[in-house]
Curated annotation (Swiss-Prot):
GO cellular component term, pick one: cytoskeleton
UniProt organism field: Caenorhabditis elegans
Family stated for the protein in its record: Belongs to the actin family.
Chain's gene name: act-4
Note: In this organism there are four genes coding for actin. The sequences coded by genes 1 and 3 are identical. There are a few variations in the actins coded by genes 2 and 4.
Propeptide: 1-2
Locations listed in the record: Cytoplasm, Cytoskeleton
Xref: InterPro entries: Actin, Actin/actin-like_CS, Actin_CS, ATPase_NBD
Primary location class: cytoplasm
Protein name: Actin-4
A GO BP annotation: actin cytoskeleton organization
Length: 376
């Protein structure tokens, strides 16, 4: 977009990463961890310009001396003071814009508590003085980004996973299923199974190292039992990873045992169904006439769907659950890590969307509850 002064801002606040940029762009300009860090120790050097809190990449780079906190847990904001810091950082440091000059599109998890959307709305209008704002459901944006209006979205990020059936652009709320099992749980699980190998990772800073191991080395096995047998009989699946201090560790069956928890949550001591069964259950809660369209348009979205092998495994598992004649297609766009943001960018730049914004005037007249009437 040439006239940046009126471009809407699109901010996708994930539990793990915040994606932000301008409507009409094809990718977010800023992607940084949703982390606020505070020093663990007393500063002794005068004139160092030490701050009482750090956000995003700066917190990440100084993680050795900080306690890191994620203000968004399971897709829901739990610490509003820290969340304000993240938004402030987004507008002023990352995008370098004045929020009072741009409409802002925010995203939220499906089945989010109502009070949460109200608080988001309130902070945007009262703290940042935005002229207009809107809150969109993440999975719906992912479907827009894939160029569809009908399908079932399996959106799995760092904090929460949900399956959202959408028909002709409408999310079907009775069939949305939510699973509190996502990337952060997999990182914690990998920390645990690496401990069984004799490597100890305990601090919040070390958890970030394990997250990197997970992102670089893990994959989903097509057949878990068979893969376990292969790993036991040969070292062909072993990979080495160099830690920041130069020590090299070896990772074997942990590479696929970690994301296997998505399909078998019992690995984490959870009773819920895996992502394949949750997707199937979501489809089965829909009207019998639209199921065929949903099976043929199963769209993966979010960072936790980035594991190599996940689409093939989903195809195999859902085929086993569905009627034998059903055509099943899993769509895994290469940019699915950012598809929520991309969908937001598309939505906010549509001419038909311009009347959907909640304006400052409407907010002043109705208060925060306006969000339930205008955003659905």
């Amino acid at each position: 977009m040439c006239d940046d002064e009126v471009a809407a801002l699109v901010v996708d606040n994930g539990s793990g990463m915040c994606k932000a940029g301008f409507a009409g762009d094809d990718a977010p300009r800023a992607v940084f961890p949703s982390i606020v860090g505070r020093p663990r120790h007393q500063g002794v050097m005068v004139g160092m310009g030490q701050k009482d809190s750090y956000v995003g990449d700066e917190a990440q780079s100084k993680r050795g001396i900080l306690t890191l906190k994620y203000p968004i847990e399971h897709g829901i904001v739990t610490n509003w003071d820290d969340m304000e810091k993240i938004w402030h950082h987004t507008f002023y440091n990352e995008l370098r814009v004045a929020p009072e000059e741009h409409p802002v599109l925010l995203t939220e998890a499906p089945l989010n508590p109502k009070a949460n959307r109200e608080k988001m709305t309130q902070i945007m209008f009262e703290t940042f003085n935005t002229p207009a704002m809107y809150v969109a459901i993440q999975a719906v944006l992912s479907l827009y980004a894939s160029g569809r209006t009908t399908g079932v979205v399996l959106d799995s990020g760092d904090g929460v996973t949900h399956t959202v059936p959408i028909y002709e652009g409408y999310a079907l709320p009775h069939a949305i299923l939510r699973l509190d099992l996502a990337g952060r749980d997999l990182t914690d699980y990998l920390m645990k199974i690496l401990t069984e190998r004799g490597y100890s990772f305990t601090t919040t800073a070390e958890r970030e190292i394990v997250r990197d191991i997970k992102e670089k080395l893990c994959y989903v096995a097509l057949d878990f039992e068979q893969e376990m047998a292969t790993a036991a009989s040969s070292s062909s699946l072993e990979k080495s990873y160099e830690l920041p201090d130069g020590q090299v560790i070896t990772v074997g069956n942990e590479r696929f045992r970690c994301p296997e928890a998505l399909f078998q949550p019992s690995f984490l001591g959870m009773e819920s169904a895996g992502i394949h069964e949750t997707s199937y259950n979501s489809i089965m809660k829909c009207d019998i006439d639209i199921r065929k369209d949903l099976y043929a348009n199963t769209v993966l979205s979010g960072g936790t769907t980035m594991y190599p092998g996940i689409a093939d495994r989903m195809q195999k598992e859902i085929t086993a659950l569905a009627p034998s004649t059903m055509k099943i297609k899993i769509i895994a766009p290469p940019e699915r890590k950012y598809s929520v943001w991309i969908g937001g960018s598309i939505l906010a730049s549509l001419s038909t969307f311009q009347q959907m914004w909640i304006s400052k005037q409407e907010y002043d007249e109705s208060g925060p509850s306006i969000v339930h009437r205008k955003c659905f």
